[in-house]
């Protein structure tokens, strides 16, 4: 038998991309049903038949007033909830009804976002080689990744399904996409985060007031991104480069955020001072990510931070001395969509890359070169992604 003509090292080098992973397109989608935060307390207590809990309703109104949210989108309509009263109780068996919603609607909303990203990318969907799908909404087999693959008509694609990750996972899908793109020459990775609050919606409880926080903050939405290394400058225009990515669990944070899937749905609880834990550790995360780059001025980078709530953003700003402008895109998404869990950071990236062109800035990162993306969620887990913007261009794509 003849000996091999190439070595393993040569094969490995041939499998790897030359340049860093890039974000090539972003698409977003929401349900049609829009709810305004100013009206939501009255609606929420009426639909859950809880108007008699007057003190709790006043507390919920104050939560909504302080949320910095103007509106949210929700698949669950008043008509649907009226027909499914078990979902309006605090602790009533309702998992079947919730599952019936999410196993259909999560991939459907993800498909709408994916189609927008494919349209912007402008390349045949047959070029998609990998799919990473993430949702905190329900579990099914075959999963939402399979359903989306079939719905889009993708033939040969390597799939990864991530269930029950929570709000940090928008950073996770980018970290995974980066690893896939840079280690598989020519790979084009589609990431999709699709979140529906049907698994978490429930009525109020006087004995579990912390559960009202999620009811005041969470909304539905899906975001999709197209990623790949070594973009073809003739037909692809990068939006951001993914420079590095890391995940960490914050010290002394066990139980800070947890969620448990039960017959009553997915019950979330906030058990500690989440804003304080994040702000206490944020500078260390920044130093670990940017010290190799010689960057220590946190106002010199653009920010994409998961908007877990206004208190988190306020305390992070105060801790590192951020100018208000740095969180503009993050606060805009919180205001217009609420907390959409894993999908949020992709919505923020989408908002950020659109605004510089409108404002006459020179890069996709608000005129700045380097940036950071943070995902915060159960664990308490933090995803940190270092980004590099690209120059704003017009006309046809050019070589990166």
Swiss-Prot record:
<dbReference type="Pfam" id="PF00195">
    <property type="entry name" value="Chal_sti_synt_N"/>
</dbReference>
<keyword id="KW-0808">Transferase</keyword>
<dbReference type="Pfam" id="PF02797">
    <property type="entry name" value="Chal_sti_synt_C"/>
</dbReference>
<protein>
    <recommendedName>
        <fullName>Chalcone synthase WHP1</fullName>
        <ecNumber>2.3.1.74</ecNumber>
    </recommendedName>
</protein>
<dbReference type="InterPro" id="IPR018088">
    <property type="entry name" value="Chalcone/stilbene_synthase_AS"/>
</dbReference>
<keyword id="KW-0012">Acyltransferase</keyword>
<dbReference type="InterPro" id="IPR011141">
    <property type="entry name" value="Polyketide_synthase_type-III"/>
</dbReference>
<dbReference type="GO" id="GO:0016747">
    <property type="term" value="F:acyltransferase activity, transferring groups other than amino-acyl groups"/>
</dbReference>
<feature type="active site">
    <location>
        <position position="167"/>
    </location>
</feature>
<dbReference type="GO" id="GO:0016210">
    <property type="term" value="F:naringenin-chalcone synthase activity"/>
</dbReference>
<keyword id="KW-0284">Flavonoid biosynthesis</keyword>
<dbReference type="InterPro" id="IPR001099">
    <property type="entry name" value="Chalcone/stilbene_synt_N"/>
</dbReference>
<comment type="function">
    <text>The primary product of this enzyme is 4,2',4',6'-tetrahydroxychalcone (also termed naringenin-chalcone or chalcone) which can under specific conditions spontaneously isomerize into naringenin.</text>
</comment>
<comment type="similarity">
    <text>Belongs to the thiolase-like superfamily. Chalcone/stilbene synthases family.</text>
</comment>
<comment type="pathway">
    <text>Secondary metabolite biosynthesis; flavonoid biosynthesis.</text>
</comment>
<dbReference type="InterPro" id="IPR012328">
    <property type="entry name" value="Chalcone/stilbene_synt_C"/>
</dbReference>
<dbReference type="GO" id="GO:0030639">
    <property type="term" value="P:polyketide biosynthetic process"/>
</dbReference>
<dbReference type="InterPro" id="IPR016039">
    <property type="entry name" value="Thiolase-like"/>
</dbReference>
<dbReference type="GO" id="GO:0009813">
    <property type="term" value="P:flavonoid biosynthetic process"/>
</dbReference>
């Amino acid at each position: 038998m003849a000996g091999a003509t190439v070595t393993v090292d040569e094969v490995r080098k041939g499998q790897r991309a030359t340049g860093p992973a890039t974000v090539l397109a972003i698409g977003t989608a929401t349900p049609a049903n829009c709810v305004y935060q100013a009206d939501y307390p009255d609606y929420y207590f009426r639909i859950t038949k809880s108007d008699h809990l007057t003190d709790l309703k006043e507390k919920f109104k104050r939560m909504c007033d302080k949320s910095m949210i103007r509106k949210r989108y929700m698949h669950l309509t008043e008509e649907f909830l009226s027909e499914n009263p078990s979902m309006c109780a605090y602790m009533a068996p309702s998992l079947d009804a919730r599952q019936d919603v999410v196993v259909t609607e999560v991939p459907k909303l993800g498909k709408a976002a994916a189609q927008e990203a494919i349209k912007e990318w402008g390349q045949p969907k047959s070029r998609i080689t990998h799919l990473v799908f993430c949702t905190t909404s329900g579990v099914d087999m075959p999963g939402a990744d399979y359903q989306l693959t079939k719905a889009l008509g993708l033939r040969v694609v390597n799939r990864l399904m991530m269930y029950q990750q929570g709000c940090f996972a928008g950073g996770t899908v980018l970290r995974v996409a980066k690893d896939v793109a840079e280690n598989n020459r020519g790979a084009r990775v589609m990431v999709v985060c699709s979140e529906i609050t049907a698994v978490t919606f429930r009525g109020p409880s006087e004995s579990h007031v912390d559960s009202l926080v999620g009811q005041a903050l969470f909304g539905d939405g899906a975001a999709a991104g197209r990623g790949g290394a070594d973009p073809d400058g003739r037909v692809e225009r990068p939006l951001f480069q993914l420079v590095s990515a890391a995940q960490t669990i914050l010290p002394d944070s066990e139980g800070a955020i947890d969620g448990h899937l039960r017959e009553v749905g997915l019950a979330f609880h906030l058990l500690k001072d989440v804003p304080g834990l994040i702000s206490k550790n944020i500078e260390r995360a920044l130093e670990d990510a940017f010290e190799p780059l010689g960057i220590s001025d946190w106002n010199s980078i653009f920010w994409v931070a998961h908007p877990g709530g206004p208190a988190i953003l306020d305390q992070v700003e105060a801790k590192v001395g951020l100018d208000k402008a740095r969180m503009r895109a993050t606060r805009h998404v919180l205001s217009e969509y609420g907390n959409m869990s894993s999908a949020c950071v992709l919505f923020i990236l989408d908002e950020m890359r659109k605004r510089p062109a409108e404002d006459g800035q020179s890069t996709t990162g608000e005129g700045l070169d380097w940036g950071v993306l943070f995902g915060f969620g159960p664990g308490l887990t933090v995803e940190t992604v270092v980004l590099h913007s690209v120059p704003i261009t017009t006309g046809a794509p050019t070589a990166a």
